[in-house]
């Protein structure tokens, strides 16, 4: 595994892991308690201008409907546990060797090799490129058809606050709700504030999105910071006084622009395949950026297991796209609009999903959360292997 960072100073905030992704993590023996994961039992969409609840049960009965809870987890805690599972000697398969401070500067899809910044050339049976929204690997796949990611007009601020800071303040103590995610809207969809706990409900995570932030001096680096007073300056225009009191506690605020790209027609070429933001960058409105990358990893893990002949790789990658590309493309479309998602956007997403109707928010949640990438991948592989056995036996 080639990683351009040092992995020594990981930063970030929390993310949500919806049932479609949590089933994968649990299958990998991720232990929620070891990462301080919070099972989110309730969710609501609230008019942030007057604090009226618009949709009280946005994620109602997650466990009974989809068999698994929705989790919130600090991304550093999740990364730490995933890295341990990948590199430790215990467990199935060979431990992964992580080569840090190695930035890839060029890809060769046909030769299955990469060149790093220091001139080192590395070869493999298959390159799995997870190089983000500004992927350079995507040009190897699409050639001159490549479409660069661009500004969306949206920017976001993120911060974390210890729960005790709210509980010790009479003005905010009553607003703390364990195991709950809340989405506050502003007038005209100009902004949104997402609030949920992480780290065993001991830390509150905030994501403030808007098209009205001054982004003239803001880049895409999520490590960039602004003064803690900046979120409140905007919140005074967007939200009710009660919510302003919450935003006032912001500290160590990170601020960056959000970029996106529409769906692309293919995710692989020769012996190079795109995953994650390199394949399907999306905004945060469905909370599926990380979840879709997890689905990518799960599908590839199953489809490439016990491949002993390079000649099998192409067929397996075609299966990967069959399982993942239309779904990832639909999620891109659904994710790039402030919820609740309008019917026109649901219709555009449904064009990628033959046999599925997305007539309501409930339809969207049902499609997104009920999908079992593990079962889909195993079933597709079983069909392929059955055909291969029949062919080898001489019946075809």
Swiss-Prot record:
Domain of life of the source: Eukaryota
GO terms for MF: FAD binding; monooxygenase activity
UniProt KW keywords: FAD, Flavoprotein, Monooxygenase, Oxidoreductase, Virulence
Coiled-coil residue spans: none
Cofactor names: FAD
Family to which this protein belongs: Belongs to the paxM FAD-dependent monooxygenase family.
Protein's job: FAD-dependent monooxygenase; part of the gene cluster that mediates the biosynthesis of the phomopsins, a group of hexapeptide mycotoxins which infects lupins and causes lupinosis disease in livestock. The role of phomE' within the phomopsins biosynthesis pathway has still to be determined. The pathway starts with the processing of the precursor phomA by several endopeptidases including kexin proteases as well as the cluster-specific S41 family peptidase phomP1 and the oligopeptidase phomG to produce 10 identical copies of the hexapeptide Tyr-Val-Ile-Pro-Ile-Asp.
Protein's name in the database: FAD-dependent monooxygenase phomE'
Source organism: Diaporthe leptostromiformis
